Amino acid sequence: MAFDFPDQFRFADSHEYVRQEAELVRVGLSAYAVDQLGDIVFVDLPEVGDDLSRGTSFGTVESVKAVEEMYAPITGKVIQRNEAVLANPEELQNDPHGEGWLLVIRPSELAQIEELMDSATYSAKVAAA
């Protein structure tokens, strides 16, 4: 299955994406990862105000197939979480790159974004998987 990964996104090896929005960053799970999980039944996210460290677990996503950890693609503070996805996890499945976003983070270092994969590199990675 072919996936369309937006050019303005950057991706972590663990399949989380970031989209910079001025001084904030929106974080979500890539369409590829969501597809691999199957039917999503539960999402656990950190609280607003929590500090995240790049590469450490910030929550879980549970599907009928598995429970997977999600990892912070960058370091920062949680400014907002998507309450709609918490209440209705199918939203993540329906539109992972849009309304199915997970968190908004105020990054400690915007430069960390550039260390993530661009959409072309990520697309090649998942195509080879």
From Swiss-Prot:
Keyword Transmembrane helix: no
Cofactor names: (R)-lipoate
SUPFAM superfamilies according to UniProt: Single hybrid motif (SSF51230)
Bound cofactor: record note: Binds 1 lipoyl cofactor covalently.
Entry keywords, A to Z: Lipoyl
One Pfam short name: GCV_H
InterPro entries: 2-oxoA_DH_lipoyl-BS, Biotin_lipoyl, GCV_H, GCV_H/Fam206, GCV_H_sub, Single_hybrid_motif
N6-lipoyllysine carried by residues: K65
GO BP of this protein: glycine decarboxylation via glycine cleavage system
A GO term from the CC aspect: glycine cleavage complex
Residues of the Lipoyl-binding domain: 24-106
Family: Belongs to the GcvH family.
Quaternary organization: The glycine cleavage system is composed of four proteins: P, T, L and H.
Protein name listed in UniProt: Glycine cleavage system H protein
